[in-house]
Amino acid sequence: MIRKVLYFALLCFFGICVVPHDVFAYIEKEFAVVRIMDKAAGKTQVVTIPLNQNTQIDGLILNARNCKQSDPFDAENFFVFLEIYTKSDGRIFSGWMNRNEPGQNPLQNDAYDVWLEKCE
């Protein structure tokens, strides 16, 4: 019986006091700043999108669901969960974008390219 109590006490102590080293902290932000390239018009623009609101820019409708910044003590990075629609094709993108690795998961289609710049 005493062994079980000691074992339980040790588990509780180490379970509470030991913190994994891989803990990531993120700062939730209110806006996503994205760069949009309109290939047909040959222009790029930087647009600030509020979270959870449909924002229409040219032929695109963008909705940023979540935007976060990495811990300020780590290398600065930003992540956004973005949904992009066109009136003709419906949803053309839904997923996470990573600012430090723009080639990992950007929107690249015939008419537009979209990249994350930062979160504010």
Task: Go through each PLM region and give its residues.
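Bacterial N-terminal signal peptides
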Residues: A9-C17
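N- and C-terminal low-complexity/disordered segments
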Residues: I2-K4, H21-E120
